[in-house]
């Protein structure tokens, strides 16, 4: 079971928190194309613990994309890094780095690297994907995978390219992800469009829910909400989830080199 800590970089691992559904069919999103981001994009997210209306900064995450080559093929090298602030380091220090080498045409990953230190618990895993032979070779062995397999980081960029106009409210959008040498059959539930106020400002946004795993610090079920910008960037704006006391809020607080103007922004806070 995938564990999530209060100060873990929830942004990078938002798609780790879904409940696996082993009987779900393979998703039909092979062949998706990138229409939302470009090389050079950088996004800063801040993690807050909120209780009684107060916001306490707990950590920070960054996502960057650069153009690279992998085995002679053009790829997006996407990196997600996160850390807790010094005050929270005294309780639970987090230093995480996730990397993915993503095919520029198919948005499928060739390689995924996870190098994390969470409260002194260190994990390193290096996974190479063969999307044609349907295998994933990790630090621990070779595993069979399904079509159009995603990793943690590539899943974030994949989700930004979903065409939500094709869906009705409460539709489930499935995809497969490989993590910790296991395949997870995941989905998000589309909840429509609305205005959202964050610590950055006010936006027109698209809202959806992941289904959380029971037994983590989060409540089981569809308690987590996420919002992306209702413009061609589909930029992640906010993630919000209740915990046993208070809630965790992750807000986009900075960006550069977006592919399109952030037209969803109504006003800056």
Range-by-range predicted roles:
Residues 1-8:
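Bacterial N-terminal signal peptides that target proteins for export
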Residues 21-129, 167-269:
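Acidic, serine/threonine-rich low-complexity disordered tracts
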Residues 11-20:
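Hydrophobic h-region of N-terminal signal peptides that target proteins for export
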Residues 121-163:
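Hydrophobic, well-structured mid-protein blocks that either form specific transmembrane helices
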């Amino acid at each position: 079971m995938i564990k999530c800590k209060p100060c873990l970089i929830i942004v990078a691992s938002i798609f780790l928190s879904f409940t696996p559904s082993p009987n779900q069919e393979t998703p039909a999103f092979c062949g998706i194309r990138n229409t939302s981001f470009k090389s050079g994009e950088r996004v800063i997210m801040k993690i807050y613990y909120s209780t009684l209306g107060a916001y306490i900064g707990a950590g920070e995450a960054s996502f960057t994309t650069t153009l690279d080559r992998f085995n002679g093929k053009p790829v997006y090298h996407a990196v997600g890094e996160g850390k807790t602030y010094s005050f929270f380091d005294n309780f639970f220090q987090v230093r995480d780095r996730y990397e993915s080498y993503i095919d520029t045409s198919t948005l499928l990953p060739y390689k995924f690297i996870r190098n994390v230190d969470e409260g002194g618990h260190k994990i390193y895993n290096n996974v190479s994907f063969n999307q044609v032979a349907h295998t994933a070779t990790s630090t621990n062995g070779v595993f069979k995978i399904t079509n159009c397999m995603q990793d943690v980081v590539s899943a974030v960029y994949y989700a930004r390219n979903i065409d939500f106009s094709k869906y009705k409210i409460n539709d489930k959008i499935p995809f497969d992800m490989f993590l910790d040498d296991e395949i997870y059959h995941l989905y998000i539930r589309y909840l429509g469009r609305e205005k959202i106020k964050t610590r950055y400002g006010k936006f027109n946004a698209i809202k959806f829910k992941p289904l959380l795993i029971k037994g983590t610090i989060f409540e089981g079920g569809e308690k987590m909400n996420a919002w992306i910008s209702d413009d061609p960037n589909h930029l992640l704006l906010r993630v919000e989830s209740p915990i046993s006391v208070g809630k965790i809020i992750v807000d986009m607080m900075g960006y550069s080199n977006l592919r399109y103007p952030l037209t969803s922004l109504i006003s800056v806070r």
